Amino acid sequence: MDNEEQKITLVDEHGNEELYNVLFTFDSEDYGRSYVLLYPSEAEADEEVDIQAYAFMPDENHDLGEGELIPIESDEEWDMVEEVLNTFLGDQDQD
């Protein structure tokens, strides 16, 4: 990812839009899917935030693009995403 933060707008079931920053994306060979982790764009740097995770179908450049986000539904898939997130956060703490 380049220095410019990627942003994405999520629309809830009531039609409200909220802007999120892309924390990172990754692929899973085990599940054959790509994933994106997001956090609210108005969050402060030292603020604890709820991180959202979704599966997505990458575009031809293997980027997030304009595609639809797919909810993660299985416990096994959530466990894998949490493990990747914890590894990412652990690596960030070491920097």
Curated annotation (Swiss-Prot):
InterPro entries: UPF0473. Belongs to the UPF0473 family. HAMAP family: UPF0473. This is UPF0473 protein PEPE_1260.
